[in-house]
């Protein structure tokens, strides 16, 4: 069930834009074939995003080609340690001309716990999932908390939240509240210092 929620969440994060034309497709794996779609402001560039959920030795990757705003393009990549030996990672590449090149995933770093932790959570259809302790590793000294929603004709307003350890705070901007369909909106982006584990 956790993987089903995560895959659904990955598709939500990569929301479609609606006058530039870009390839538009989603798929499980490394590549996809789709169709050309006109973009609308503020989605003004074409992009390709690779997303991965890893848990222990198992991983699932998805690919998304779409219209994006330049602010999303600046993110470049992200790696979130959500706890329980699980990660959500993304590689974003935007381009002026198709096809956009890939940014490959390196192997997960063999990092050791660094003495810090963050609240960890991943939730779909909720903005307040049950938290657990995500043990930070390596250079992860920040806690990320992202809450947002995507409005669809059916089933309607899809809420989501994501919490975990990160190495640096992403430059993400909050979105204006709206009920326009097929759009992804960030309601909360918090990034704080990780919490030091109590000495035994």
UniProtKB/Swiss-Prot annotation:
- Disulfide bond sites: 22-46, 25-32, 39-67, 73-94, 95-100, 118-143, 136-165, 169-191
Per its UniProt record, what SMART domains does this chain match? Answer: LU
Name of one Pfam family that matches: PLA2_inh
Signal sequence span is 1-19
Example of a GO MF term: phospholipase A2 inhibitor activity
Tell me the SUPFAM superfamilies matching this sequence. Snake toxin-like (SSF57302)
On whether Disulfide bond is a keyword of this UniProt record, the answer is yes
Record-linked CDD domains: TFP_LU_ECD_PLIGA
Which body tissues produce this protein?
Expressed by the liver.
Q: Which domain of life is it from?
A: Eukaryota
Which GO terms of the cellular component aspect does the record hold? extracellular region
Query: Where is it mainly found?
Result: secreted
* Keywords, sorted A to Z: Disulfide bond, Glycoprotein, Phospholipase A2 inhibitor, Secreted, Signal
> Where are the annotated glycans?
176
Checking InterPro entries in the record gives:
CNF-like_PLA2_Inhibitor, LY6_UPA_recep-like, PLipase_A2-inh_b-type, PLipase_A2_inh_N, Snake_toxin-like_sf
Cellular compartments annotated = Secreted
- Family statement: Belongs to the CNF-like-inhibitor family.
Complex formation: Occurs as a mixture of oligomers. Tetrameric arrangement appears to be the predominant quaternary structure.
Q: What does this protein do?
A: Inhibits the enzymatic activity of phospholipase A2 (PA2).
Q: What is this protein called?
A: Phospholipase A2 inhibitor LNF1
